[in-house]
Protein backbone atom coordinates (compact mmCIF):
# COMPACT_ATOMS: atom_id res chain seq x y z
CA UNK A 1 0.00 0.00 0.00
CA UNK A 2 2.82 2.39 0.86
CA UNK A 3 4.50 1.48 -2.43
CA UNK A 4 1.33 2.37 -4.37
CA UNK A 5 1.09 5.75 -2.65
CA UNK A 6 4.75 6.46 -3.39
CA UNK A 7 4.19 5.69 -7.08
CA UNK A 8 1.26 8.09 -7.22
CA UNK A 9 3.17 10.81 -5.38
CA UNK A 10 6.02 10.58 -7.88
CA UNK A 11 3.53 11.10 -10.71
CA UNK A 12 1.72 14.09 -9.27
CA UNK A 13 4.34 16.11 -7.43
CA UNK A 14 5.71 17.46 -10.70
CA UNK A 15 2.38 17.75 -12.49
CA UNK A 16 1.49 21.44 -12.52
CA UNK A 17 -2.19 20.84 -13.24
CA UNK A 18 -2.61 18.54 -10.25
CA UNK A 19 -0.72 20.94 -8.00
CA UNK A 20 -2.86 23.86 -9.19
CA UNK A 21 -6.14 22.03 -8.56
CA UNK A 22 -5.11 20.95 -5.06
CA UNK A 23 -3.56 24.26 -4.01
CA UNK A 24 -6.53 26.16 -5.45
CA UNK A 25 -8.79 24.16 -3.15
CA UNK A 26 -6.55 24.77 -0.15
CA UNK A 27 -6.35 28.51 -0.83
CA UNK A 28 -10.01 28.98 -1.71
CA UNK A 29 -11.27 27.34 1.48
CA UNK A 30 -10.27 30.23 3.80
CA UNK A 31 -10.92 32.85 1.11
CA UNK A 32 -14.44 31.53 0.58
CA UNK A 33 -15.10 31.49 4.32
CA UNK A 34 -13.81 35.04 4.79
CA UNK A 35 -15.90 36.31 1.87
CA UNK A 36 -18.95 34.61 3.36
CA UNK A 37 -18.29 36.26 6.71
CA UNK A 38 -17.84 39.66 5.07
CA UNK A 39 -21.04 39.31 3.06
CA UNK A 40 -23.24 38.06 5.90
CA UNK A 41 -22.02 40.64 8.40
CA UNK A 42 -22.65 43.39 5.86
CA UNK A 43 -26.25 42.40 5.03
CA UNK A 44 -27.45 41.54 8.55
CA UNK A 45 -28.19 44.68 10.62
CA UNK A 46 -26.20 44.96 13.82
CA UNK A 47 -29.36 45.35 15.92
CA UNK A 48 -30.56 41.86 14.91
CA UNK A 49 -29.21 39.37 17.48
CA UNK A 50 -28.19 36.65 15.03
CA UNK A 51 -24.83 34.93 15.36
CA UNK A 52 -24.27 32.76 12.32
CA UNK A 53 -20.70 31.96 13.32
CA UNK A 54 -21.19 30.46 16.75
CA UNK A 55 -20.23 26.88 17.50
CA UNK A 56 -21.38 24.28 16.67
CA UNK A 57 -23.68 25.86 14.03
CA UNK A 58 -20.68 27.31 12.17
CA UNK A 59 -19.71 23.83 10.94
CA UNK A 60 -22.83 23.57 8.78
CA UNK A 61 -22.19 26.99 7.25
CA UNK A 62 -18.52 26.41 6.47
CA UNK A 63 -19.33 22.95 5.15
CA UNK A 64 -21.82 24.42 2.70
CA UNK A 65 -19.31 27.02 1.49
CA UNK A 66 -16.52 24.53 0.84
CA UNK A 67 -19.04 22.22 -0.81
CA UNK A 68 -19.16 24.58 -3.79
CA UNK A 69 -15.38 24.87 -3.97
CA UNK A 70 -14.94 21.10 -3.86
CA UNK A 71 -17.65 20.65 -6.50
CA UNK A 72 -15.29 22.21 -9.03
CA UNK A 73 -11.71 21.58 -8.00
CA UNK A 74 -11.88 18.14 -6.37
CA UNK A 75 -13.79 16.79 -9.36
CA UNK A 76 -11.12 18.24 -11.64
CA UNK A 77 -8.39 16.74 -9.49
CA UNK A 78 -9.99 13.31 -9.66
CA UNK A 79 -10.28 13.57 -13.43
CA UNK A 80 -6.70 14.73 -13.81
CA UNK A 81 -5.46 11.74 -11.79
CA UNK A 82 -6.59 9.37 -14.54
CA UNK A 83 -6.64 11.48 -17.71
CA UNK A 84 -2.93 12.29 -17.34
CA UNK A 85 -2.30 8.55 -17.62
CA UNK A 86 -4.03 8.57 -21.00
CA UNK A 87 -2.41 11.77 -22.25
CA UNK A 88 1.04 10.66 -21.10
CA UNK A 89 0.47 7.10 -22.34
CA UNK A 90 1.65 5.77 -18.96
CA UNK A 91 -1.32 3.57 -18.10
CA UNK A 92 -0.16 0.66 -20.26
CA UNK A 93 3.40 1.22 -19.04
CA UNK A 94 2.27 0.86 -15.42
CA UNK A 95 0.61 -2.44 -16.23
CA UNK A 96 3.60 -3.73 -18.20
CA UNK A 97 6.06 -2.89 -15.40
CA UNK A 98 4.26 -5.01 -12.83
CA UNK A 99 1.10 -3.37 -11.50
CA UNK A 100 -2.08 -5.37 -11.81
CA UNK A 101 -5.19 -3.55 -13.00
CA UNK A 102 -6.67 -3.78 -9.52
CA UNK A 103 -3.49 -2.33 -7.98
CA UNK A 104 -3.49 0.50 -10.51
CA UNK A 105 -7.05 1.46 -9.58
CA UNK A 106 -6.35 0.97 -5.87
CA UNK A 107 -3.37 3.32 -6.06
CA UNK A 108 -5.64 6.07 -7.40
CA UNK A 109 -8.25 5.49 -4.71
CA UNK A 110 -5.67 5.47 -1.92
CA UNK A 111 -4.02 8.67 -3.09
CA UNK A 112 -7.41 10.35 -3.46
CA UNK A 113 -8.35 9.26 0.07
CA UNK A 114 -5.13 10.70 1.51
CA UNK A 115 -5.62 14.00 -0.35
CA UNK A 116 -9.21 14.19 0.93
CA UNK A 117 -8.05 13.48 4.48
CA UNK A 118 -5.58 16.38 4.26
CA UNK A 119 -8.32 18.66 2.94
CA UNK A 120 -10.64 17.54 5.73
CA UNK A 121 -8.09 18.46 8.38
CA UNK A 122 -7.63 21.81 6.63
CA UNK A 123 -11.41 22.30 6.62
CA UNK A 124 -11.44 21.77 10.38
CA UNK A 125 -8.60 24.24 10.92
CA UNK A 126 -10.18 26.83 8.60
CA UNK A 127 -13.49 26.57 10.45
CA UNK A 128 -11.81 27.10 13.81
CA UNK A 129 -9.88 30.08 12.46
CA UNK A 130 -13.07 31.61 11.08
CA UNK A 131 -14.74 31.17 14.45
CA UNK A 132 -11.86 32.98 16.15
CA UNK A 133 -11.93 35.71 13.50
CA UNK A 134 -15.67 36.19 14.03
CA UNK A 135 -15.16 36.48 17.77
CA UNK A 136 -17.09 33.32 18.60
CA UNK A 137 -16.39 31.29 21.70
CA UNK A 138 -14.73 28.05 20.67
CA UNK A 139 -16.91 25.15 21.81
CA UNK A 140 -15.70 21.84 20.48
CA UNK A 141 -18.30 19.15 20.97
CA UNK A 142 -16.46 16.03 19.87
CA UNK A 143 -19.53 14.40 18.34
CA UNK A 144 -20.30 17.50 16.23
CA UNK A 145 -16.70 17.95 15.14
CA UNK A 146 -16.33 14.31 14.11
CA UNK A 147 -19.68 14.37 12.32
CA UNK A 148 -18.79 17.33 10.14
CA UNK A 149 -15.26 16.11 9.49
CA UNK A 150 -16.67 12.77 8.35
CA UNK A 151 -19.32 14.44 6.19
CA UNK A 152 -16.67 16.63 4.60
CA UNK A 153 -14.34 13.71 3.95
CA UNK A 154 -17.10 11.64 2.38
CA UNK A 155 -18.23 14.59 0.26
CA UNK A 156 -14.81 15.46 -1.18
CA UNK A 157 -13.94 11.79 -1.68
CA UNK A 158 -17.22 11.29 -3.53
CA UNK A 159 -16.57 14.29 -5.78
CA UNK A 160 -13.03 13.12 -6.47
CA UNK A 161 -14.07 9.54 -7.14
CA UNK A 162 -16.82 10.66 -9.51
CA UNK A 163 -14.18 12.67 -11.37
CA UNK A 164 -11.84 9.69 -11.46
CA UNK A 165 -14.49 7.35 -12.89
CA UNK A 166 -15.67 9.86 -15.49
CA UNK A 167 -12.04 10.48 -16.50
CA UNK A 168 -11.49 6.73 -16.76
CA UNK A 169 -14.41 6.45 -19.18
CA UNK A 170 -13.95 9.58 -21.32
CA UNK A 171 -10.13 9.88 -21.08
CA UNK A 172 -9.90 13.66 -21.74
CA UNK A 173 -9.97 16.21 -18.90
CA UNK A 174 -11.92 18.97 -20.66
CA UNK A 175 -14.55 16.63 -22.10
CA UNK A 176 -14.92 14.80 -18.78
CA UNK A 177 -15.52 17.98 -16.81
CA UNK A 178 -17.93 19.46 -19.36
CA UNK A 179 -20.03 16.29 -19.31
CA UNK A 180 -19.98 16.16 -15.50
CA UNK A 181 -20.91 19.82 -15.16
CA UNK A 182 -23.79 19.57 -17.65
CA UNK A 183 -25.17 16.48 -15.94
CA UNK A 184 -24.74 17.58 -12.31
CA UNK A 185 -25.75 21.22 -12.82
CA UNK A 186 -28.53 20.92 -15.41
CA UNK A 187 -29.66 17.46 -16.49
CA UNK A 188 -30.03 15.83 -13.06
CA UNK A 189 -31.74 18.80 -11.32
CA UNK A 190 -34.09 19.39 -14.26
CA UNK A 191 -35.07 15.73 -14.55
CA UNK A 192 -35.42 15.29 -10.78
CA UNK A 193 -37.63 18.35 -10.27
CA UNK A 194 -39.59 18.54 -13.52
CA UNK A 195 -40.05 14.86 -14.35
CA UNK A 196 -39.43 12.62 -11.34
CA UNK A 197 -41.07 14.92 -8.78
CA UNK A 198 -44.16 15.47 -10.91
CA UNK A 199 -44.61 11.74 -11.49
CA UNK A 200 -43.77 10.28 -8.08
CA UNK A 201 -43.96 13.24 -5.69
CA UNK A 202 -42.55 13.00 -2.18
CA UNK A 203 -38.83 13.38 -1.57
CA UNK A 204 -37.52 10.54 -3.73
CA UNK A 205 -36.28 13.04 -6.32
CA UNK A 206 -33.56 14.05 -3.85
CA UNK A 207 -31.81 10.68 -4.08
CA UNK A 208 -30.06 11.17 -7.42
CA UNK A 209 -26.23 10.85 -7.30
CA UNK A 210 -25.02 14.44 -7.56
CA UNK A 211 -27.68 15.69 -5.15
CA UNK A 212 -26.91 12.92 -2.66
CA UNK A 213 -23.26 13.99 -2.58
CA UNK A 214 -24.22 17.67 -2.36
CA UNK A 215 -26.64 17.05 0.50
CA UNK A 216 -23.88 15.69 2.71
CA UNK A 217 -23.24 19.36 3.51
CA UNK A 218 -26.34 21.21 2.26
CA UNK A 219 -27.56 24.78 2.66
CA UNK A 220 -27.67 25.11 6.46
CA UNK A 221 -30.80 27.22 6.82
CA UNK A 222 -33.41 25.02 5.16
CA UNK A 223 -34.84 24.29 8.59
CA UNK A 224 -35.53 28.00 9.14
CA UNK A 225 -37.17 28.26 5.73
CA UNK A 226 -39.38 25.29 6.59
CA UNK A 227 -40.52 27.02 9.77
CA UNK A 228 -41.95 29.86 7.66
CA UNK A 229 -44.01 27.50 5.47
CA UNK A 230 -47.49 26.35 6.43
CA UNK A 231 -47.61 22.70 7.58
CA UNK A 232 -49.79 21.62 4.65
CA UNK A 233 -47.30 23.17 2.21
CA UNK A 234 -44.16 21.67 3.72
CA UNK A 235 -41.59 20.19 1.35
CA UNK A 236 -38.26 18.50 1.98
CA UNK A 237 -35.42 20.64 0.66
CA UNK A 238 -32.52 18.25 1.32
CA UNK A 239 -31.75 14.74 2.47
CA UNK A 240 -31.05 14.11 6.12
CA UNK A 241 -27.42 13.44 7.02
CA UNK A 242 -28.05 9.73 7.46
CA UNK A 243 -29.92 9.36 4.18
CA UNK A 244 -27.27 11.36 2.31
CA UNK A 245 -24.54 9.16 3.79
CA UNK A 246 -26.32 5.92 2.87
CA UNK A 247 -27.15 7.10 -0.66
CA UNK A 248 -23.59 8.35 -1.19
CA UNK A 249 -22.05 5.07 -0.03
CA UNK A 250 -24.35 3.11 -2.35
CA UNK A 251 -23.42 5.29 -5.32
CA UNK A 252 -19.73 5.05 -4.46
CA UNK A 253 -20.04 1.28 -4.40
CA UNK A 254 -21.72 1.28 -7.82
CA UNK A 255 -19.10 3.65 -9.23
CA UNK A 256 -16.34 1.48 -7.77
CA UNK A 257 -17.80 -1.58 -9.49
CA UNK A 258 -18.09 0.36 -12.77
CA UNK A 259 -14.45 1.48 -12.51
CA UNK A 260 -13.28 -2.05 -11.73
CA UNK A 261 -15.20 -3.50 -14.70
CA UNK A 262 -13.81 -0.79 -16.97
CA UNK A 263 -10.27 -1.60 -15.84
CA UNK A 264 -10.77 -5.34 -16.34
CA UNK A 265 -12.37 -5.12 -19.78
CA UNK A 266 -10.43 -2.31 -21.44
CA UNK A 267 -7.52 -3.00 -23.74
CA UNK A 268 -5.11 -0.26 -22.68
Placement of each model-derived feature along the sequence:
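Aromatic- and glycine-rich beta-strand/loop motifs that create alpha-glucan
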Residues: 1-26
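Residues that define the loop-to-transmembrane-helix transition and helix capping
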Residues: 16-19, 102, 174-175
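Secretory targeting signals
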Residues: 18, 22-81, 106-171, 185, ...
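Central hydrophobic cores of alpha-helical transmembrane segments
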Residues: 21-26, 176-187, 203-207
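Transmembrane helix boundary and interhelical loop/hinge segments in multi-pass membrane proteins
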Residues: 77-97, 101-102, 109
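Short hydrophobic, aromatic-rich alpha-helical segments embedded in or entering the lipid bilayer
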Residues: 198-230
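Junction motif at the cytosolic side of a transmembrane helix
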Residues: 246-268
Amino acid sequence: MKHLLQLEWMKYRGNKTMVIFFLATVILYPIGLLLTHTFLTSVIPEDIPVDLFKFPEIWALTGYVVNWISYIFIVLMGMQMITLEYSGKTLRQNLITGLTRAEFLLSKVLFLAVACLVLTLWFGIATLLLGLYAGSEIQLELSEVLKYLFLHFLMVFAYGFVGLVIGLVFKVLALSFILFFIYASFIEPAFAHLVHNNIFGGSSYLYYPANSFKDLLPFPYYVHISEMIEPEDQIQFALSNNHAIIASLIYLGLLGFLAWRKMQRSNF
